């Protein structure tokens, strides 16, 4: 079974660590690559600088409220790029604002999940994301150059 590569873009280290830990326990081989802001996310996806030797991820979990280039800008840039636009992107944000949900889908997000405030629900949400995207959904796989 091929390892699924996930790009996790979240500026909260505690959330990022917990998400990585939950996905690693999912049962399917998974490698989570974490970055803390939108500039790093785009550099990772374009394999620039220190990310030149990284794999293009199979899936991305993206927070909206990031320092510098926010998640909306990252989403717009990725979905406008002919090489990257097929990358499935799940928004995982503390925002429950209808305008953030609508904007994310308008920009091409594949799903929008609000981060729960309590630990049990947070774990359940990340587990559900993993079960759907790694267990049910078929992820597009491009040949790695």
Question: What residue ranges belong to the model's regions?
Answer:
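Conserved acidic segment of CheY-like receiver
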Residues: 3-14, 19-24
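Residue-level signal for the "D+5" position in two-component response regulator receiver
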Residues: 34, 66-69
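Acidic, metal-coordinating helix/loop segments flanking the phosphotransfer/catalytic sites
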Residues: 34-59
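Active-site residues of response regulator receiver
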Residues: 62-63
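Short, glycine/charged-rich "phosphate-handling" switch motifs in NTP-dependent
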Residues: 110
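C-terminal output helix
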Residues: 117-128, 137-143
